[in-house]
Amino acid sequence: MKFGNLGVWFFFDGLSSPDSAKAAQRIESLGYSILWIPETVGKNPMVLASWLLANTKKLIVATGIANIYHREPGVTLSAQQSLAEQSNNRFLLGLGVSHKPIVEGVRGLKYGPPVATMRKYLEDMEASPYTGVSGSEVPPTVIAALGPKMLALASE
């Protein structure tokens, strides 16, 4: 997947679905090749990605980032494969461990050691069954890295 040197990161929570589609179309018309969408406590990034991909022609849509604590690894794999297949491989899955105050304070979940937790999550994703139709390419996964140990994992 090639996505050029310049993309856009945009927070869509304040926009309606029709306005989100128009914004993505505008971003695409301006020549940007990739649109990064975050995950907080608003719109589901996988659902939003599906909508934006369905309303653009060549724009790559990437989660930047999807929080691994918000969904089970097999569910993430299924979403990744489905989005890649329905968009002709224009979906890029970006994952991250988020931050302890968000995971524990906002979501009420237990925050684990970042690198070990991410490694286990990726292993569990890879081991998860998926029986749906796959795209012509293996969809890429990128991970957010805030330090050298996570950066080393990202390079694997």
Describe the residue ranges of each PLM region.
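N-terminal beta1-alpha1-beta2 module of alpha/beta enzyme domains
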Residues: 1-56
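Alpha-helix-loop-beta-strand connector modules within alpha/beta enzyme cores
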Residues: 2, 45-66, 70, 117-128
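Hydrophobic faces of well-ordered beta-strands that scaffold small-molecule active sites
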Residues: 4-10, 33-37, 60-64, 91-95, ...
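Active-site beta-loop-alpha junctions enriched in small/polar residues
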Residues: 11-13, 40, 66-68, 96-100, ...
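Aromatic/hydrophobic pocket-lining residues that form the small-molecule binding cavity
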Residues: 17-20, 45, 73-76, 114-121
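Glycine-enriched alpha-helix->loop->beta-strand junction motifs that scaffold or abut catalytic
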Residues: 31-33, 55-59, 87-89, 153-156
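Pocket-flanking alpha-helical
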Residues: 47-50, 74-82
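Internal, glycine-rich beta/alpha segment that forms the wall or movable "lid"
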Residues: 77-156
